[in-house]
């Protein structure tokens, strides 16, 4: 069969995939594969913002590095943390060139907010829908590139390697299409749909990690899974959606089943602004003490117009569920949110498989340690996808492209167990996964 050749194939069209495409040399022919429409990705769901040292009069790299290491339990890759923090501001500034509209102060400077685990105001944001703002801006930029082909609503049925060539079997519009490249970037996101309750989009199924594993890539620390302490709890409909870290950053209180503050008992200094894993664990301690799994988040003491203007998306979503966060506490509970482990990569996003790169949540750069600091995820997606692009650019041979004749390996014929995904989701309830086995 014939495989159409590309210089680079990017699987995934969130921030990592889009930003990589924008930083690749314009002489390269690039194919981007999206599982759904371009905006239906995890990146677009990110609310809080991008953490970076933008105000050097009040912040510095060492403070951001320290916060990242503390949140990560000092299990971080310090070299990659330094890359993340020191190169991050350049990429945040570059977003402005693509039209990203960060909230501004009256003097025109970027408004930097505070989130849990940070000792300084350093989160650039767009209301409470920063991810969507960044994704839509980057999409506009990519669509202007004549060297990039985007296929939406695709299903990657197969990805294997023969020599230096990656072979792709893609289902698109009901037909099989075959592609090949010597440079593959996996930007496929996380594993949220392995869990019953997750803040992730429906496409976060971990298939990119599986494809990498099948090709011999190192897979690292899959037990490093983060639970966000404040997901809106709709137990009746078995749904949850994220209530941004920034709500606590703006002063919201965590309340127990008696609608009493409790974080001061466990974190007398940081209280509600402790890192995510700490807050989630403390909520479990409080649940054990009270015998109830009911928790609330309360910012209703703040000015109602401030709440509506600062958190318009969250306000409207909880209002649809029957709660007015300007007048009352809203029910929340820890929910699966982010994978810190994944496909092992080095400081420029390369795996141990020649020509295979990984970026974003599917990759394990080690910058997050055992627990990600709030708003470091979009920063990681930007910095390391750019470094991947720079590495590919450096090794670009400017070869002629055409088609490759090859046989694609046939499926082994083994039927998939019916309902296995649903069964896995049901056996991983949130109460069993806040604490890892070794803890």
Give the role of each language-model region.
Residues 8-31:
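N-terminal Rossmann-like FAD-binding beta1-loop-alpha1 element of flavoenzymes
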Residues 28-45:
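Glycine-rich FAD pyrophosphate-binding loop
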Residues 52-84:
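Glycine-rich active-site loop/strand segments that organize a redox cofactor
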Residues 96-183, 187, 231-234, 254:
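Conserved redox-cofactor binding core of oxidoreductases
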Residues 195-207, 366-390:
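A conserved FAD-binding loop/helix module that cradles the flavin
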Residues 211, 217-324, 328, 381, ...:
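An anion/pyrophosphate-binding glycine-rich loop and adjacent beta-alpha core
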Residues 352-371:
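Short FAD-binding loop at a beta-strand-to-alpha-helix junction that anchors the flavin cofactor
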Residues 433-439:
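Conserved small/polar residues in nucleotide/adenosyl-binding loops
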């Amino acid at each position: 069969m014939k495989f159409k050749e590309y210089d680079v194939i990017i699987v995934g069209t969130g921030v990592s995939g889009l930003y990589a495409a924008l930083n690749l040399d314009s002489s390269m022919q690039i194919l981007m594969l999206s599982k759904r429409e371009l905006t239906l990705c995890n990146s677009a769901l990110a609310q809080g913002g991008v953490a970076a040292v933008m105000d050097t009069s009040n912040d510095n790299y060492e403070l951001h590095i320290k916060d990242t290491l503390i949140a990560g339990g000092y299990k971080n890759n310090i070299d990659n943390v330094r890359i993340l923090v020191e190169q991050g501001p350049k990429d945040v500034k570059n977003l402005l060139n693509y039209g990203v509209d960060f909230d501004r102060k009256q003097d025109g400077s970027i408004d930097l907010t505070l989130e849990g685990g940070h000792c300084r105001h350093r989160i650039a944001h767009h209301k409470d829908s920063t991810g969507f703002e960044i994704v839509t801006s980057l999409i506009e930029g990519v669509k202007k590139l004549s060297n990039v082909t985007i296929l939406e609503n695709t299903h990657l049925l197969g990805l294997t390697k023969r020599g230096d060539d990656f072979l792709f079997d893609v289902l698109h519009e009901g037909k099989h299409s075959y592609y090949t490249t010597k440079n593959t970037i996996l930007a496929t996101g996380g594993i949220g749909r392995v869990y019953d309750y997750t803040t992730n989009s429906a496409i976060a199924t971990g298939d990119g990690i599986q494809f990498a594993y099948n090709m011999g890539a190192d897979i690292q620390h899959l037990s490093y899974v983060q639970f966000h302490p404040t997901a809106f709890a709709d137990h009746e409909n078995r749904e949850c959606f994220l209530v941004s870290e920034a709500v606590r950053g703006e002063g919201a209180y965590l309340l127990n089943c008696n609608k009493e503050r409790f974080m001061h008992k466990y974190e007398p200094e940081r209280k509600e602004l402790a890192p995510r894993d700490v807050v989630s664990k403390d909520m479990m301690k409080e649940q054990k003490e009270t015998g109830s799994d009911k928790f609330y988040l309360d910012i209703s003491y703040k000015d109602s117009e401030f709440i509506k203007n600062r958190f318009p998306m969250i306000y409207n979503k909880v209002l649809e569920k029957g709660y007015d966060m300007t007048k009352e506490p809203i029910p929340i509970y820890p929910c699966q949110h982010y994978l810190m482990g994944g496909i092992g990569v080095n400081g420029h996003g390369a795996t141990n498989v020649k020509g295979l790169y990984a970026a974003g949540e599917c990759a394990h750069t080690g910058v997050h340690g055992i627990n990600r600091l709030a708003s470091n995820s979009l920063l990681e997606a930007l910095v390391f996808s750019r470094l991947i692009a720079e590495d590919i650019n450096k090794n670009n041979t400017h070869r002629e492209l055409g088609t490759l004749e090859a046989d694609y390996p046939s499926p082994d014929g083994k039927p998939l167990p019916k309902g296995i995904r649903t069964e896995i989701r049901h056996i991983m309830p949130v109460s069993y996964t806040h604490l890892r086995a070794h803890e």
